[in-house]
């Protein structure tokens, strides 16, 4: 068997007829039209001490990361207005900016008051104004909030910059001494905190739909078991204790169920458990490997990876019974499915025919066309922003596991700052407010 479901094989190691398709599917290898130029001018500051965060830089980076906007560098700006009355539109027209944002930060009673305004340069009209207040420690939160408000006003799509991310680090000190940590950070990798630390592997962390719980696989008992942990209190609950593989947990949209993979009856199959009643139901029943479940928004449809056709491809089925339907047809390897928020796009790990590289790709579910988003070689574990505009994934750079962000339109691709050691298994949170 080829290197089937690389992530699953890692778990298995720790634990101990092709379907035809019409050749109408299309492979696209790059993005197209350019992002809209936007200027986020450095915010004015009326206090004495230097602020710990650059608000304008955070807002600018957020808008850039979406793939919709191309920020104009500060050094190229002709003027630096900090309030609406100071904006000279000819300066921004000369730079080709479509939008310009200005802001001002004022200390007030131990807090910071931030006023901001966004303008359409061509029409010279204000399109958004607002204010937000908080403490020094909340500067990043306020910047992400401003970016969220601006993005939604300009695109009609709810911003996802105030969300969080989970990921796992593995720091090796010697042959038999590796420290694994489960981290939570801002979506952009900032402000990471440790939720769990172990000398045994941690895999497949997943946010619950309420953003208050997480599920993950831990080897702390020397074999894989699935746990649910409450983020605020740290309280944990063991969900599975079966022989063999216990892996790949996935939450139902209402948070009442978990789908996961068990090999207790032989080969890996997908099961669903009701977390209240603890009733366990088997979903797949096939001699192949079935893994990496992901719920559709209806709470009944499961997308998953299987080699039942000879090579890893993506299928979907109903948790209440019925056969599996193949979804992916382009390429000789498609795995680790995730859906966009509107369920029109499937994000996956893809390998083209005749190639050995694994890349993040998106498939238009209506047309079947596939677009490759990345240019790296060993991508894995894609996770999608709740608004569907960005993907975070794990890959390797210079021999080290790292996390990368790519916009769904392919315009932006950049590394995320994370801790030392191997970094893997990212998971994007739902909206948190």
Curated annotation (Swiss-Prot):
Its main location: periplasm. It holds the Pfam family PD40. It is found in: Periplasm. GO terms for cellular component: periplasmic space. Keywords: Cell cycle, Cell division, Periplasm, Signal. Belongs to the TolB family. PANTHER family: PROTEIN TOLB, PROTEIN TOLB HOMOLOG. The Tol-Pal system is composed of five core proteins: the inner membrane proteins TolA, TolQ and TolR, the periplasmic protein TolB and the outer membrane protein Pal. They form a network linking the inner and outer membranes and the peptidoglycan layer. This is Tol-Pal system protein TolB. It comes from Pseudomonas savastanoi pv. phaseolicola (strain 1448A / Race 6) (Pseudomonas syringae pv. phaseolicola (strain 1448A / Race 6)). The gene is tolB.
